[in-house]
Amino acid sequence: MATEPEAAEPVVPSLVDRYFTRWYKPDVKGKFCEDHCILQHSNRICVITLAESHPVLQSGKTIKSISYQISTNCSRLQNKVSGKFKRGAQFLTELAPLCKIYCSDGEEYTVSSCVRGRLMEVNENILHKPSILQEKPSTEGYIAVVLPKFEESKSITEGLLTQKQYEEVMVKRINATTATS
């Protein structure tokens, strides 16, 4: 009796892939490989995360601490949002710093907003357990949630790359590093 070939199980997309569109900002502020990923929901809310190629997510890196204290007068933890129209939210530009990540090797990385809008919340869980940022960067290890202005919600993706474009950038980087070796 011949056995039927097993049908391959259909790949179920993750929650993030199902409900969010991934956008990428490579080399933020001109810093090589410091790439950010913006997860945009259909309701226009954007979740700021680190891209897979960010140096913090590479093997061997250990996060010592994370700080939302941007300057002496500005802390993203002081952001208090209330009401239907999200009063009290801090307004962010594309280059506004969200947090600083300090690694055990002395390296310091600043995570920027990448989108203009209001800061809805920051992820306080990564302050207490920084390893979440490396273990689950797209889900529990997110940096912040930003709500773009309604009028600008379509145009925020103009300076960002799609998943396919970002993969092409990654291939070019790999080819450039192997060519110089």
From Swiss-Prot:
Actin-binding protein that regulates actin polymerization, filopodia dynamics and increases the branching of proximal dendrites of developing neurons. Interacts with F-actin. Interacts with G-actin. PANTHER family: PROTEIN ABITRAM. InterPro entries: Abitram, GCV_H/Fam206, Single_hybrid_motif. One of its GO terms (biological process) is regulation of filopodium assembly. This is Protein Abitram. The keyword Nucleus applies. Depletion of ABITRAM by siRNA or neutralizing antibodies results in cell death within a few hours. Keywords: Actin-binding, Cell projection, Nucleus. The keyword Nucleus applies. It holds the Pfam family GCV_H. One of its GO terms (molecular function) is actin monomer binding. It is found in: Nucleus speckle; Cell projection, Lamellipodium; Nucleus; Cell projection, Growth cone. Belongs to the ABITRAM family. GO terms for cellular component: dendrite; filopodium tip; growth cone; lamellipodium; nuclear speck; nucleus.
